Regions:
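N-terminal leader/targeting segments
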Residues: 3, 22-25
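N-terminal secretory/targeting leader peptides
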Residues: 24-113, 132-327
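A gly/proline- and charged-residue-enriched helix-loop-helix capping module
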Residues: 115-130, 134
Length: 327
């Protein structure tokens, strides 16, 4: 090898090593609204696995997501505020836990689209703009739905009228819906639900289908009302300053990883709902399928209640979102 090519090779190696030395590892501290053992967090863990694998393949050492824990670290309804302030960088949560700060996020609960379809139709871009303005966070996307909120009861019922007057535990998202069907909504944190059911403080609860065994609530469940309503809107948000620290190619990687994880989460959810129904029926739990007319009353009450709130609290963005997410 002549002297000039040899010098060029040495220079190339030096520049390559310098570039590697300059590549700074971006570290993201993440929390989830539920403990790691809860099924929903499994979708987030899959997302973390996909990110880790892709980073190792394409950008080794440049990005890491450190999972700090669930509500034992920061209470679930305070996590998005913690991300806004930069106490944590990434939050995996659900709409009901920060709807007071971002009312528009409820539109995902009545969305007729899958998460990746929402991105393609511009829903994510609009929600991202809203999140940046209201909570200083970037909206990465929806991760996990297809688990309709379902009414589980400690006593059997025959129809929609039997739900009137019953005290039913719910998240803030479902308060308006339960009032419309004549039930009495009671907002109770998940860890307190079992005791409330056992002591008769409430007659039942609403929860995403397929997930009640995470909390042991199947032991006090006698009846399940069908159909369910809404789609659980579990989402990932990231502190804006932290997002801006992430190079564009790694931002793209995170978005693509979220979309892949969302597709896997959909099938995982469909399988889960089927398995729960089979297991509960074997335990003697009664599934009550409302007649078509009553089922329509139930779903109409659910969707109109939530859209009423969204449109009232967000007259500028609510109509846009409704048009986007309605097929």
């Amino acid at each position: 090898m002549s002297r000039v090519p040899r010098i060029l090779l040495v220079v190339a190696i030096i520049l390559s090593l310098a570039s590697m030395a300059e590549a700074k590892t971006v570290s993201i501290k993440a929390v989830t609204a539920w403990p790691k053992s809860v099924w929903e967090v499994g979708n987030f863990m899959k997302f973390l696995d996909i990110v880790k694998e892709r980073v190792a393949q394409k950008y080794p050492g440049q990005l890491e997501i450190q999972y700090a824990g669930g509500p034992e670290v920061i209470p679930n309804q305070e996590q998005v505020e913690a991300a806004r302030m930069g106490v944590v960088d990434m939050v995996f949560t659900t709409d009901g836990y920060y709807v007071s700060a971002v009312p528009e996020i409820n539109a995902l609960s009545v969305s007729m689209l899958d998460g990746w379809e929402e991105r393609a139709k511009g829903v994510n871009a609009l929600l991202d703009k809203i999140h940046q303005e209201k909570v200083n966070c970037v909206y990465l996307g929806r991760l996990g739905h297809n688990l309709p909120f379902t009414i589980y009861l400690t006593k059997p019922v025959k129809g929609l009228d039997d739900l009137k007057g019953l005290k039913i535990r719910c998240s803030p998202t479902l308060v308006g819906f339960l009032k419309k069907i004549g039930s009495n909504p009671v907002v109770i944190p998940p860890p307190e639900v079992y005791t409330a059911l056992e002591r008769g403080v409430v007659d039942g609860f609403t929860w995403p289908a397929g997930l009640i065994k995470d909390w042991g609530w199947e032991k006090v469940t006698k009846c399940v009302v069908q159909p369910g309503v809404y789609n659980g809107a579990n989402v990932i948000v990231i502190n804006k300053k932290k997002w801006d620290e992430i190079p564009a190619d790694l931002q793209k990687l995170l978005i693509e990883a979220e979309d892949e994880a969302a597709r896997l989460a959909k099938q995982r959810a469909l399988d889960l709902v089927k398995n729960e129904k089979e297991a509960l029926q074997k335990m003697g739990v009664q599934y009550v399928e409302l007649p078509p007319a009553e089922a329509k009353k139930l779903t109409d009450a659910a969707y109109s209640a939530l859209w009423d709130i969204i449109l009232e609290k967000s007259p500028a963005n609510g109509p846009k979102l409704k048009e986007m997410v309605t097929k």
